[in-house]
Amino acid sequence: NLLAMQALLAGDEATGLSSLRGKVDLIYIDPPFDSKADYRTKINLPGVDIEQKPTVIEQFAYSDTWQDGTVSYLKMLYPRLVLMRELLSEKGRIYVHIDWHIGAYVKVIMDDVLGKENFKNEIIWKSAVGDTSNKNKKYIKSHDTIFFYNKIQGIQVWNDIFQEYSEKNKNAYRY
């Protein structure tokens, strides 16, 4: 039963992971980026009357600050990557989505945990075009990185998925 074999685990350190040791074919994580910021979500409430603009309440979403800075962040991430390596099957692969704040450090840790020889690719996820005007006077941060590793060297799984680009996308990414 294919549905019984597929599972999506969301959250941090879900219970019962030991039963999955060596059975997970694909892991994708999007951990915090060590941005040293607190994040809030906005909740729009309708105004009392038609003339009044909606009221906005900000609610705390999560904190991406670490007691000892980047060192604390890396100490949090390392054992989780070790656990994920143990969960991967022989043909398992892991994708770690990260940005410029911490990417270089995470790559070194992943090389240590999964082995440099198991690094397959650095996928660039273009996130925005950014302000390229002369007033900006700096390079724009316009992408995130997804590091891709196999558990074991030489084992490759590729499921070819092709979808024709729309004309709008063809024009936007014509280079």
What are these regions (language model features)?
Residues 1-175:
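Core catalytic lobe of class I
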